[in-house]
Amino acid sequence: AARNPGSWANGLKVAIIDSFADQVLSVGNTAGMSVGFGVTQTASGTVPGSGSTSSLDGFFKGIITDIGTGTISVKFLSHTPSGGTETEIDYSASGVYRFNSSSDITAVNNSAVGVATVAVNSVSDWFDSQTITTTNNITNNSTTISWNQIAERPGTSAYAAARNSRFDEVHVVVIDDDGDITGNAGTILEKNLNLSKAKDAEFSAGSTS
């Protein structure tokens, strides 16, 4: 983590997070599912408009990014209304564009064939559960820092969006893990937020990130 050599930097910790997933769905049985498979669910909810509201129909689509014990982590990708065209939409933690436990989900393989339909027992927000653990080597006490206390969830940079790409952003923080530098273990020394993982990404001013 240090810019120059020396034991002074041995206590530094670098933590990185990207938009790996949006939600964790507890489904019990994950048989037949694999990372990279699609997930669909009947769309529901009410969308406010100008002087009126409308009810969602059609279906939501996402992708499985991880499989745990009875759980799958998913990215929310799009909404396709009944008889309409698929539209890319970002996950909304407190809105209607998210998977929920009100109806089953169907896992779809890479050949667009449904391989499993299961009930969703519960849903949790992936980003809100991500933490960084620091350890003071002198006292052996651990401190937990929640990522959602450091920054908003990573998303898509304007540079990537203009090139029809998504989910390239990443946050990087440098932490005084054991307190040797600041005297306070767990102090965040640097925050580099909303960087891009894209090889050719640029800041709005034109320099590479």
Q: How should these model regions be labeled?
A:
Residues 1-209:
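Surface-exposed assembly/interface segments
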